[in-house]
């Protein structure tokens, strides 16, 4: 196995690095496939963004949640270590995971001594079929904000000449509450809200109009 890849890893399935800086060191997680054909997330470190050294395998699938793990992201939030990834070939599991390509959030503890994630919570990031490859960034005021691809390898309908077609989700602020990942639209969207209309006890029937609810954009 080439230097830098975890022993026994696939030479083809190694992609999607996510890089961040802590102090004078840079870190990167990447999607990888292990010897048993399932996903794993190796962690690397560098001082110059050119020479990278393998630190650990943060977590690995062991054929439990899909196969290849793509587009990983790793960060600490509200006292928890959080790993986001997009597994291929997921199997449906109750109402939490749908079959095919999906998303996965793993939370727990992780020491910066060994950089191994000890799981406490596993959940889907989004229950929609057209949601994939979420990535996060930190805003200047310290918020963890996530954006994802609003489409799926399983369901995209772009014409052959328009493979670039697609769109991204509304940015979401992340937080951890009671051991689960919470998401809310970024607060900057509030300034675009207009008049608020409240309707209560409306029976669900055929096509109907609600007083005060009109316009091209309704949230």
Where do the language-model regions lie?
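Hydrophobic core segments of beta-strands in well-ordered, beta-rich domains
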Residues: 1-36, 41-44, 54-57, 71-75, ...
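Surface loop/turn signatures of beta-propeller and other carbohydrate-active proteins
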Residues: 1-21, 52-73, 113-134, 190-191, ...
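Active-site-proximal structural scaffolding
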Residues: 12, 36-39, 65-67, 97-101, ...
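Residues that flank catalytic or metal-binding motifs in active/ligand-binding sites
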Residues: 15, 39-42, 54, 70, ...
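Structural motif
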Residues: 36-42, 91-107, 157, 170
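A short local loop/turn or secondary-structure capping micro-motif enriched for an aromatic residue
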Residues: 36-38, 62-64, 91-93, 126, ...
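Conserved Ser/Thr-centered positions that define the repeating blades of beta-propeller domains
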Residues: 43-49, 109
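Beta-rich accessory regions
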Residues: 104-130, 135-219
